[in-house]
């Protein structure tokens, strides 16, 4: 992630996002995890809810709502929509990207390439097998699944920030050492002080 971020922070950001979200497979029923990850190119994105109306029924769930800041959504195949049910339990809905509307509201100066659009659905029927409790009912025993999700996000995003800082310092040093003046001499080797 550090090396990728040194070339393109937006790409690294999206990779980190999908990698962390993929660890949710450890909380899914096996059939849902298989449905998503049998495709080796599966990419997941999510975002915090702006609004939602989720009606859980016996065999399926009727979903309407809008979620934002979904980094990498143009490349994603599955969207993780977070909601709180009537019992105040946080749950995740796995929605195929083909069912949502993308809304390009990502007007920023930095990390524009993450394409962190919002997405919305209106009265979409989702099978109940696509819904699972958020961070409950861990089904895998590997140590990575015991690390809190927010810590995984934080360590990835801080790696990106450190890589950007390192790349910026290296660029400034290289620029200072190797910039050439009007007469093709390195400015660092000239005897007079120049200011631009």
Residue ranges and their predicted role:
Residues 66-103:
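A short core secondary-structure module
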Residues 109-196:
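Glycine-rich beta->alpha junctions and the first turn(s) of the following alpha-helix
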Residues 45-48, 97-108, 113:
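Active-site glycine-rich loop that binds ribose-phosphate moieties when present
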Residues 1-76:
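Glycine-rich flavin
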Residues 51-52, 90, 116:
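Short, acidic/polar N-cap/turn motifs at the starts of alpha helices
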Residues 61, 79, 115-119:
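Short beta-strand micro-motifs in enzyme catalytic cores
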Residues 55-57, 96, 122:
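A structural detector for beta-sheet-dominated domains
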């Amino acid at each position: 992630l550090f090396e990728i971020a040194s070339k393109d922070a937006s790409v690294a950001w999206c990779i980190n996002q999908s990698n962390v979200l993929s660890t949710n497979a450890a909380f899914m029923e096996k059939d849902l995890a298989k449905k998503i990850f049998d495709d080796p190119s599966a990419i997941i994105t999510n975002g915090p809810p702006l609004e939602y109306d989720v009606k859980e029924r016996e065999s399926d769930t009727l979903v309407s709502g809008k979620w934002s800041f979904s980094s990498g959504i143009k490349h994603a195949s599955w969207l993780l929509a977070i909601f709180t049910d009537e019992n105040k339990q946080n749950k995740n809905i796995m929605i195929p990207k083909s069912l949502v509307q993308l809304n390009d509201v990502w007007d920023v100066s930095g990390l524009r390439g993450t394409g962190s659009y919002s997405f919305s659905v209106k009265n979409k029927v989702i099978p109940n097998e696509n819904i699972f409790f958020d961070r409950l009912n861990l089904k895998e025993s590997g140590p990575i699944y015991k690390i809190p999700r927010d810590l995984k996000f934080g360590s990835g995003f801080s790696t990106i920030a450190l890589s950007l800082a390192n790349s910026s310092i290296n660029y400034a040093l290289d620029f200072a050492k190797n910039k050439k003046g009007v007469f093709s001499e390195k400015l660092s080797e000239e005897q007079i002080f120049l200011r631009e």
